[in-house]
Design a protein with these regions (language model features):
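C-terminal transmembrane-helix exit sites in multi-pass transporters
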Residues: 58-80, 218-237
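Glycine-/small-residue-enriched transmembrane alpha-helix faces in small-molecule transporters
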Residues: 98-123, 263-273
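Helix-helix packing/entry segments at the starts of transmembrane helices
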Residues: 52-57, 124-140, 191-225
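Cytoplasmic-side transmembrane-helix entry/capping segments in multi-pass membrane proteins
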Residues: 18-28, 74-87, 103-109, 128-140, ...
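Membrane-interface interhelical linkers
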Residues: 1-27, 143-184, 191-204, 253-273
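Hydrophobic transmembrane alpha-helices of multi-pass small-molecule transport proteins
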Residues: 77-94, 235-254
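Hydrophobic/small/kink-forming positions within alpha-helical transmembrane segments
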Residues: 29-37, 59-64, 89, 111-115, ...
Length: 273
């Protein structure tokens, strides 16, 4: 009932929008669709913890793009946190070594697409409202799924040996009751994420909010080990730690900056009496 009422309100808001705004909202939604597909395709070949950690170069990209496109100011501390986390990503990917896998570039592409998606979110903060934004985003999900539905059901790809492509284009596995339960939980979680994340990026500076997304890294490590038995390598542990440290450092510096700003504000005369 809640979902139906939300999208009912969303459709009414979409109808009110001018064509230009609908186009921009749709471009934003397709950026997220591309990020989602690249992310899940990379999971066909890579451990969950590595995919999530590489994907979390996205807050770094959000910080940089917010400075270039949105003209938000980033100081030396934010730049330092970006560089620290970038070293972590390099340690995980290890380009030029036998540990590097081309599928890692898919996770990196997902990060870039997601960063552009959030820049759209921030730049469109004064256009439409949250109902319309999330509704168009979910219509983009639906439209992009239709071609894959026909491929998967009516012309599934024969196994190629490429785990990522097979994961995307193989024939359907009919879900069990347990599978459907997990799918429904995931769908509801994504809806909640869409609403809360979109609202946050519309109301707070993108470069300030981005580091908070790093909380997903320790969770991905835990679930990767607990469910799939994917234990990261030593260098991957170091890389993940650096990415997490970079995010925490950025959050800490923003908190220090807020305290410094507050302390410089003169106390009102009435409060001093």
């Amino acid at each position: 009932i809640l979902v139906v009422s939300f999208f009912g309100a969303g459709i009414r808001e979409v109808i009110k929008l001018p064509g230009r705004v609908i186009l921009l909202f749709s471009l934003r939604g397709m950026c997220l669709v591309i990020a989602m597909y690249l992310y899940f395709i990379s999971l066909g070949s890579l451990p969950l913890s590595e995919v999530v950690s590489i994907f979390f170069v996205s807050p770094l990209l959000i910080t940089l793009l917010s400075s270039i496109i949105l003209k938000e100011k980033i100081g030396i501390h934010r730049i330092s946190s970006v560089l620290i986390a970038l070293v972590g990503v390099i340690l995980i990917m290890r380009p030029g070594t036998e540990n590097f896998k081309p599928e890692m570039l898919l996770a990196l592409g997902a990060a870039l697409s997601y960063a552009i998606f959030q820049i759209f979110t921030r730049s469109l903060k004064s256009e439409g409202n949250l109902y319309a934004l999330v509704t168009i985003q979910n219509f983009c999900y639906l439209i992009s799924a239709i071609p894959l539905l026909f491929i998967n059901w009516f012309n599934p790809l024969e196994p190629t040996g490429n785990l990522s492509m097979d994961f995307l284009l193989r024939g359907p596995d009919y879900p069990t009751f347990q599978d459907m339960t997990f799918i429904i939980i995931c769908a509801f979680s994504v809806l909640v994420l869409s609403i809360t994340s979109s609202h946050a990026y519309r109301t707070v500076e993108a470069s300030l909010l981005a580091p908070f997304e790093y909380v997903a890294i320790p969770f991905s490590i835990f679930w990767g080990i607990a469910i799939f038995g994917d234990w990261p390598s030593n260098l991957s542990w170091i890389g993940m730690s650096l990415i997490l440290f970079g995010g925490i450092y950025a959050i800490y510096r923003e908190r220090v900056r807020e305290i410094e700003i507050i302390s410089k504000v003169p106390m009102p005369a009435s409060a001093a009496m």
